[in-house]
């Protein structure tokens, strides 16, 4: 039997054909529901995470006023627009584990707006009374956050464009859209919507608040005061490994489940969301779908710290050292005994001692679970995805652990090796001489500095938007990272790593 094209009309047939291997939405969609959430940045992670939580609320708990309107701000978002619109905004989540695969058709995304087509439509949608939450997955670079000063990059050309009152109806950045929509709600006497960051950053809500309030103060101090007093920006820890979808994934879905999907999502069974209960205009009962909703922002920060330092820090170790050694997938790296031991020892000996205890959380078990997740061969998680946008990741995932280890005189050799591997990676040439693309918003600047610096870290450490003054002046750190850089340049990753494994 030929695969069925995914759309509303074919859902019943898809369910019948898939039997116990596929789940489909049976709730109402379209004009029968209200779109209470506008989500900016509809990629794989959003569709495997927040959209799945909302789908469960709509399917199992009758929530019909928090369907999602997706928004794409960038020209490349046209591909997602076309894929979703061609199948009534439905898509398939494929969960893969050692036990097999399970398909789940998700219907919580009810519509999609492509800003380059109609920027006014996006502003109007955010400003609409039915909109209670504007959620974000815009990656670290989308926040225009200076890691060194912790301030808005107000001098950035796109921010400067959006700060010009003449451009209020044609913004470029997320903050330009948020500002325009909130200004309109303020004029209409509505409450501000909650701005909910779902990006993988520590204190993501606090950073979002500070960036938006800073932007608003430069435009209209009165509106900035209203946002500060009445707005809400929950902090959240998000977790679900979601690799890029490949043509092989689409083919397998068609052949094994019988679904023809333009852009399915492949992910793992594990999913976690720890969310601060701070909302300005209502929220759905996320906890009924499995989210951990907490009252104290400190609780979120503790979970965030565990996840960013252990999971994402280890991902960085796997990604940059793995790419330099010619590996292609995360599980391949973890199958190599040397890398496997390196990751485990870095977590246990250098990162874990720096982390706070969380009641009910066994850090050793968490680390073991991470090793199992990294080793899952069925999701085929590509190293280029892990390496993407490192300038927004390394300062969060690796450097804070190094700084804290120095402060408490703890070990940090392996963490320095990871930073050195990234510095070497920035050259765009692996240890066999093969070139690869360094996909980073700061690529030109960082690549030039990496090549100019060679085995001297000073050129890169002088990028003040990424690295603070303390590390640049610490002799222990400079000695460790220089030693690692020299060894990697001379001997390559594979011959250097044994020096960092007990």
Swiss-Prot record:
It is an enzyme of class 1 (oxidoreductase). Its EC number is 1.1.1.67. The keyword Nucleus does not apply. Disulfide bonds: none annotated. Keywords: NAD, Oxidoreductase. NAD(+) binds at residues 37-48. It catalyses: D-mannitol + NAD(+) = D-fructose + NADH + H(+). One of its GO terms (molecular function) is mannitol 2-dehydrogenase activity. InterPro entries: 6-PGluconate_DH-like_C_sf (IPR008927), 6PGD_dom2 (IPR013328), Mannitol_DH (IPR000669), Mannitol_DH/Oxidoreductase (IPR050988), Mannitol_DH_C (IPR013118), Mannitol_DH_N (IPR013131), NAD(P)-bd_dom_sf (IPR036291). Pfam families: Mannitol_dh, Mannitol_dh_C. Monomer. Catalyzes the NAD(H)-dependent interconversion of D-fructose and D-mannitol in the mannitol metabolic pathway. This is Mannitol 2-dehydrogenase. It comes from Aspergillus terreus (strain NIH 2624 / FGSC A1156). The lineage of its organism: Eukaryota, Fungi, Dikarya, Ascomycota, Pezizomycotina.
